């Protein structure tokens, strides 16, 4: 009987899941869209798709080598931005999640199909694990199935799950953690809990943090269910027991978790604090939209997503009006979750104290689904009080939605909310009819009717959320078959086809997606990874270039020849009609000193004649303290003349320059200190002198946006608004200044910006137009014109090239070359600094300095020096040993546990 019920439960869930997927995602099918989020924001393509395609390829390569008898584990890849550790960078997206091993069976070209399938598979598994948990808690079969469908087909999956596939993982793991906790309390085997902790830790430490918090809360609540005597002693013993199992699970995952955490601790994305005023309360619109979209189809903001099926509205109202003691506990859990969602401080705490964000809302989905599984059978035996209360609640909710939508505020208009209100009313009326007829959940007509209503509900949700006539969410996703082709466009193919055996970097100017290097195996100067080394972030920020939008999102170096050459950028493609802002395209900026190789359509390939090898030497140095006092141009010119070190070198023969020694930089302050964009005028013009033989830049110091002064009512409703930035136009070249306000969750402390002006013009003066993309006031401390003689830049580059390494070889974890030293110097190796690199010179271990902000410096003594650098992921070896011991410990524990258990059974 139990086996038949289990089969029926999983069978009905599977059938309903397939049918609901078809109707919910119908707009994706009719519009020819994939689930790769990349047509609007690039996260889905640049981060997830490219990482998973790369991971699949890496898995196949690893096993090919293993079967061939020469196993090789590549730990570093130069195509990850400027170069980065593979495990610590890609654990956030791919490595560690057991499900992602399936990508090893598909080629990069077919990754999109697997990508779409994996999102649906994760959703399906989330429902399965919920059913396993609910059955353990003795919930009735059909209520459990509906609860699982409510859990899966919610706003969290439809929005965050489609954008970031691994965001669905905690929905799989949390029911397993709760199941494991129940098993431990019931003195059953602890393996479910241990393995759930292990897999959570391997998959993603970010969600492990949240899962740990909610698992502790769950275990604390359930403790009082299982313990009636000696509560204090048992509480301490329970902490000890769970702590032991949790630690064992963490230790089993240490081989992946430890390197990933080390990488996170060296991350440059966070660390600039948060505006405490933003943690007090959300803008007024958030609360209005939260109520509307609890069963609606829109979004609230701060990554808060509810969007539950309409039946949830009835379940919640039923719970609120129920007087049963058991239901009071459910009600308390639900209300506590709602309170946490309406106060930013909880989003801040649950998001690792970085900024207020409610990605933890999957826990609310779990609570709501559990409420549904528990309450559904009781909806057929409602008391008069409950019937009246639920009916009144539906009417009040509907009237509220009508009033809010009729307010005239565009941001509050909710497409389809009346359809949602209508559906909740239909559910309610149907339940009343069934109750009047004496039907319960066992009646076939009840099950069929509810199944049809659920299909209609999710179909309506899919229509309004995804369809172009609704919120048009599908327009943010890429067309089917487009993802791989986009990463192989003409400018990228031209760079890939360059026949040059040397080690170098490339840059695709005007190409929108940052992580194109990963699956094309190109060394680039662009990157967009949530885990980016702090030294890389800080160095690029110090350049004051416009290509850096966020701390972890950077693109090129504004075609500044010095920076390009210092980074070893040898080949460049320029798109002569690229998009820089909405409905705004730009002709490409071609740096001086490059040689045109060929052209295809609007894409031209150039060779940088002044590109330096991956290692070059200096006679003198400057300290980082001196370096940080300079603006972006000063830093660039300083690196052309002397190496920048994080500490004084041991070799006293290396000259320390007290003053910057480089090209002659001229700075002229302009009189403006404030630029406004009053009504009717959205731009300002600045005329600047330019000289053909000089690099010319416009430097904004402490540029901030004060925003548009709204009335108090408007401010309360919308909160503070940031700016879309400033579009800088000179002739046919467009550049964009990305300005972030302190209340922006991605603010990283940037206020200085440098705009490259002299685009090989012959005019004596140039007009620069600043187009303000958002109304308001833009203020800065100083605006300066900076010029640098081109001949001085070229002379310094020539000097660096004359003092460069020969016979350079790079492959995976190894870099080597030969340098002929005429006198003591410091070699700069343009690979990002990491403690995982170890250097030897002529076979002797040598100290590595952090050089030029993010690269590595090695002291070279006079003579011919053979340099070798080898890389090992920090924490990998010790993590592997910890995991090995933990797995052995689990085996020993398992044998002991089974032996002890059998002994107890025999005694009984």
Task: For the regions a language model picked out, list residue spans one by one.
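Active-site-proximal, structured, solvent-exposed surfaces of multi-pass membrane proteins
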Residues: 2-6, 657-908
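Membrane-embedded helix bundles of polyisoprenyl
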Residues: 17, 123-136, 142-226, 238-266, ...
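Membrane-interface coil-to-helix junctions
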Residues: 20-130, 149-171, 264-269, 276-305, ...
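Periplasmic/ER-lumenal interhelical loops and adjacent helix-loop junctions
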Residues: 42-58, 62-65, 98, 238-239, ...
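Extracytoplasmic/lumenal acceptor-recognition loop(s) of multi-pass membrane glycoenzymes
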Residues: 77-84, 88-92, 453-482, 494-567, ...
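Membrane-interface micro-motifs in multi-pass membrane enzymes
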Residues: 88-93, 113-125, 150-178, 185, ...
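Transmembrane alpha-helical segments
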Residues: 126-133, 173-185, 213-221, 314-318, ...
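Contiguous transmembrane helix-bundle modules in multi-pass membrane proteins
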Residues: 188, 207, 329-345, 349-484, ...
């Amino acid at each position: 009987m139990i086996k038949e019920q289990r089969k029926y439960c999983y069978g009905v869930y599977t059938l309903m899941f397939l049918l609901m997927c078809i109707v919910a995602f119908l707009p994706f099918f009719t519009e020819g869209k994939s689930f790769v989020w990349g047509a609007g924001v690039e996260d889905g393509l640049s981060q997830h798709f490219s990482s998973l395609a790369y991971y699949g390829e890496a898995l196949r390569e690893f096993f090919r080598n293993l079967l061939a008898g020469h196993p090789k584990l590549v730990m570093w890849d130069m195509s990850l931005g400027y170069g980065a550790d593979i495990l610590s960078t890609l654990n956030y997206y791919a490595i560690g999640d057991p499900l992602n091993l399936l990508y090893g069976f598909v080629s990069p070209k077919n990754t999109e199909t697997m990508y779409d399938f994996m999102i649906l598979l994760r959703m399906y598994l989330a429902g399965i694990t919920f059913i396993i948990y609910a059955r353990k808690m003795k919930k009735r079969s059909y209520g459990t199935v509906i609860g699982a469908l409510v859990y899966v087909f919610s706003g969290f999956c439809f929005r965050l799950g489609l954008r970031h596939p691994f965001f669905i993982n905690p929905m799989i793991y949390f029911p397993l953690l709760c199941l494991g906790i129940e098993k431990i309390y019931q003195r059953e085997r602890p393996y479910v809990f241990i393995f759930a902790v292990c897999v959570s830790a391997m998959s993603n430490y970010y969600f492990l943090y949240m899962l740990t918090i909610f698992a502790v809360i769950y275990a604390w609540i359930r403790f009082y269910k299982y313990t009636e005597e000696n509560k204090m002693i048992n509480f301490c013993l329970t902490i000890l027991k769970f702590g032991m199992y949790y630690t064992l699970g963490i230790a089993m995952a240490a081989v992946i978790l430890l390197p990933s955490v080390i990488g996170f601790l060296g991350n440059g994305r966070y660390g600039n604090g948060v505006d405490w005023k933003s943690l007090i309360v959300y803008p007024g619109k958030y609360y209005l939209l939260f109520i509307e979209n609890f069963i609606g189809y829109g979004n609230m903001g701060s990554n808060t997503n509810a969007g539950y099926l309409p039946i949830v509205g009835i379940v919640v109202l039923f719970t609120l009006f129920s007087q049963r003691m058991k239901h009071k506990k459910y009600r308390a859990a639900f209300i506590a979750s709602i309170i946490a969602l309406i106060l930013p401080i909880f989003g801040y705490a649950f998001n690792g104290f970085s900024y207020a964000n409610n990605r933890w809302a999957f826990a609310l989905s779990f609570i709501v689904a559990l409420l549904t599984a528990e309450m559904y059978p009781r909806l057929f035996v409602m008391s008069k009080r409950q019937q009246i209360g639920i009916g009144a609640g539906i009417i009040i909710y509907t009237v509220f939605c009508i009033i809010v939508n009729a307010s005239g505020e565009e941001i509050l208009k909710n497409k389809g909310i009346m359809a949602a209100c209508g559906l909740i009313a239909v559910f309610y009326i149907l339940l009343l009819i069934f109750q009047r007829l004496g039907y319960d959940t066992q009646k076939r007509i009840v099950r069929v009717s509810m199944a049809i209503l659920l299909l209609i509900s999710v179909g309506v949700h899919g229509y309004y959320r995804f369809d172009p006539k609704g919120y048009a969410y599908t327009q943010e996703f890429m067309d089917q078959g487009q993802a791989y082709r986009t990463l192989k466009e003409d400018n990228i193919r031209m760079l890939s086809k360059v026949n040059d055996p040397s080690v170098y970097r490339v840059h695709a100017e005007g190409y929108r997606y940052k992580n194109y290097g990963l699956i094309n195996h190109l060394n680039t100067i662009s990157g967009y990874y949530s885990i980016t080394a702090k030294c890389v972030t800080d160095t690029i920020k110090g350049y004051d270039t416009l290509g850096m939008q966020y701390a972890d999102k950077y693109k090129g170096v504004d075609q500044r020849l010095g920076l390009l050459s210092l980074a070893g950028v040898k080949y460049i493609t320029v798109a002569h009609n690229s998009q820089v802002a909405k409905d705004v395209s730009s002709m490409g900026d071609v740096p001086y000193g490059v040689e045109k190789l060929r052209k295809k359509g609007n894409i031209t390939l150039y060779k940088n004649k002044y590109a330096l090898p991956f290692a070059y030497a200096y006679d003198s140095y400057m300290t980082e303290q001196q370096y940080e006092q300079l603006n972006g141009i000063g830093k660039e010119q300083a690196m052309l003349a002397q190496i920048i070190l994080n500490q004084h070198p041991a070799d006293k023969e290396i000259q320390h320059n007290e003053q910057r020694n480089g090209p002659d930089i001229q700075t002229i302050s302009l009189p403006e200190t404030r630029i406004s964009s009053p009504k009717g005028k959205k731009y300002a013009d600045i005329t600047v002198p330019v000289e053909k033989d000089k690099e010319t830049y416009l430097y904004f110091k402490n540029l901030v946006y004060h925003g548009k002064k709204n009335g108090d009512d408007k401010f309360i409703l919308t909160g503070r608004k940031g700016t879309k930035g400033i579009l800088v136009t000179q002739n046919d070249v467009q550049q964009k200044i990305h300005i972030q306000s302190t209340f922006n969750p991605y603010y990283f402390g940037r206020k200085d910006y440098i705009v490259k002006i002299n685009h090989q013009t012959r005019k004596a003066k140039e007009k620069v137009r600043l187009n303000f993309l958002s109304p308001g006031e833009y203020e800065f401390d100083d605006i300066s014109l900076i010029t640098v003689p081109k001949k001085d830049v070229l002379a310094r580059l020539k000097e660096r090239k004359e003092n460069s390494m020969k016979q350079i070889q790079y492959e995976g974890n190894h870099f080597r070359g030969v340098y002929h030293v005429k006198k003591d110097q410091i070699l700069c190796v343009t690979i990002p600094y990491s403690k995982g690199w170890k250097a030897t010179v002529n076979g002797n271990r040598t100290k590595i300095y952090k050089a030029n902000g993010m690269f590595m410096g090695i002291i070279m003594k006079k003579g011919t020096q053979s340099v070798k650098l080898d890389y090992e992921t920090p924490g990998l070896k010790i993590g592997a040993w910890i995991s090995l011991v933990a797995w052995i410990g689990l085996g020993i524990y398992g044998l002991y546990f089974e032996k002890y258990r059998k002994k107890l059974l025999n005694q009984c």
